[in-house]
Amino acid sequence: MELHILFFILAGLLIAVLIGFSLWSARREKSRIFSNTFSTRPPSTPINNIVSDVPPSLNPQSYAQTTGQHGETEADNPVQIQQEVESSLREIKINLPGQDSAAYQSKVEETPIYSGQPVLPVQPQYQTQVQYQTQPQHIEPAFTQAPQSPIAEATSVLEQSVEELERQAAQGDVDIYSDASVRVELAKNSMQADSVAEQKPVAENNMITLYVVAPEGQQFRGDYVVQSLEALGFQYGEYQIFHRHQHMGNSASPVIFSVANMMQPGIFDLTKIEHFSTVGLVLFMHLPSEGNDVVNFKLLLKTTENLAQALGGFVLNEHREIFDENSRQSYLARVS
């Protein structure tokens, strides 16, 4: 009887030791796995040093306008224009019979030039009693599309003013050597040239842009990106990027917004998608869009949030900051 009791006691102790050893081994293994995971995985913070943007080739509407306005930007350099006009006006020499040219030259040099705004250079086309000592140097724009430049208009205005001064001086109505007369004419010409220089087209920001970026030190896999985009209704198409059409599944319907790779050249090569990875995606919508801009923007925002949730990323605004309620209101004000 005593042997049976001793046997049960030993069996119970053995079972307790085995259970304790199993629990201790499982706890140690679990602790080791979690310790390695947290030590190797970087903190989940958004990427702040993104330098890429929507490739110009993927924005055909604004790309042509930017190329066409490149020449006008070079031609309307305010500092260069102002310096040329000031030097040209100081070098005007008017000779009338019976008048000392040296005395008049000193008065012209003392005459102030009104330059509150950039003034356009002068190119007179006649030779009466007005002579230029030097020919001002002009910068030819790389692209010229305007039929009549502001420089030609300002030149015509200044030529008419000088001709009017000569006519009045010949009739004795005004003293052409009077400092007050010269100041009045120069101020009048400067004001007219300023009004011409201010007539410049203002480019409007006609694109809504949102970013989906991976956490710091991580990237999105290409096959996951394609799978998530197709699940959200995107279709692979023109420019080798994905588009969201007005009617889901109908590629013939108008495109509402698109998504491109954030890294240059911004495309998705489906033949190498298994080896593809990226730090982020850019979603953009042109304004005005097909249909209602507010409704399309809300659809874009909802799609962006769903995409970020599916990929485990973050949504950034056009300034590459975390998209918050202030960003939402700012975007809604733009599309309203």
Curated annotation (Swiss-Prot):
For biological process, the GO terms are:
division septum assembly; FtsZ-dependent cytokinesis
Transmembrane annotation, as ranges: 3-23
Q: Can the keyword Cell inner membrane be found in this entry's annotation?
A: yes
Xref: InterPro entries: Cell_div_ZipA, ZipA_FtsZ-bd_C, ZipA_FtsZ-bd_C_sf
Q: Which residues lie on this side of the membrane: Periplasmic?
A: 1-2
Q: Which residues lie on this side of the membrane: Cytoplasmic?
A: 24-336
The record's listing under Gene3D superfamilies reads: ZipA, C-terminal FtsZ-binding domain
Q: Which organism is it from?
A: Actinobacillus pleuropneumoniae serotype 7 (strain AP76)
Q: Can you name this protein? A: Cell division protein ZipA
Q: Give compartment(s).
A: Cell inner membrane
Polar residues bias locations:
59-70
Q: Which family does it belong to?
A: Belongs to the ZipA family.
Question: What NCBIfam families does the database record attribute to this sequence?
Answer: septum_zipA
Membrane-related topology note: Single-pass type I membrane protein
